[in-house]
């Protein structure tokens, strides 16, 4: 696995072991890091990543980043996975692959008041790649990416694709507003 390559304005920082990219991204954002920081942990059994944004809008408008990142993930996995793999999104950030829960997106922001402008917003991705135990059927409502026929999808390539597809979604939202995102979401 090689170090991921990101589009301009995005820069990656790898963490290893038990380090939580979401927590690190939130700490870096609170310290005033640049928007576009991608903190990631490419473990053998899990893809953990977080992206720092500086939305310059109030919280209730900035929360559009969660569905933008979700659609970005769906498009990224859809481009890399076999065509028969179904990826569905849940409003709370949950990800489903072939009908079973397979990871989640989560969000944190510098403010909790929906009417306050944000200094930063972080969206995190937690995606199980490989089953933790020897009995994957033990929890039939949960799955992992590789258990669903995606063993050829490399974590670094998926991370790169997620950031790229998310950037396309952000640019589209910036240019056209939320209507295209609503259309994309309904199509999923």
Predicted feature locations:
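Long, positively charged amphipathic alpha-helical accessory segments at protein N-termini or as interdomain linkers
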Residues: 1-35, 58-64, 68-82, 101-188
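A structural signal for short, well-ordered beta-strand segments
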Residues: 49-51, 93, 123-127
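A short acidic, often aromatic-flanked loop/helix-cap motif at beta-alpha or helix-coil junctions
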Residues: 48, 95, 153
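Catalytic palm active-site di-aspartate
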Residues: 87-99
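Primarily the active-site beta-strand->alpha-helix module of PP2C/PPM metal-dependent phosphatases
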Residues: 39-54, 59, 67
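Short, ordered beta-strand-loop transition motifs
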Residues: 40-43, 88-90, 114-115
């Amino acid at each position: 696995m090689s170090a991921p390559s990101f589009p301009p304005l995005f820069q990656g920082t790898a963490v290893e072991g038990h380090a939580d990219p979401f927590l690190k991204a939130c700490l870096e954002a609170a310290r005033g890091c640049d928007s576009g920081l991608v903190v990631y942990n490419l473990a053998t059994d899990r893809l953990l990543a977080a992206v720092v944004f500086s939305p310059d809008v109030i919280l209730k408008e900035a929360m559009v980043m969660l569905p933008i990142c979700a659609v970005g993930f769906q498009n990224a996995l859809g481009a890399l996975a076999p065509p028969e793999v179904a990826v569905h999104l849940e409003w709370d950030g949950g990800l489903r692959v072939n009908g079973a829960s397979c990871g989640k997106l989560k969000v944190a922001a510098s403010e909790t008041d929906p009417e306050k402008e944000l200094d930063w917003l972080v969206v995190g991705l937690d995606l199980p790649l490989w089953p933790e135990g020897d009995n994957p059927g033990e929890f039939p409502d949960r799955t992992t990416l590789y258990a669903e026929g995606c063993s050829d999808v490399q974590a670094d390539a998926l991370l790169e694709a997620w950031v790229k597809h998310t950037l396309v979604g952000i640019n589209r939202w910036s240019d056209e507003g939320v209507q295209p995102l609503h259309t994309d979401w309904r199509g999923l």
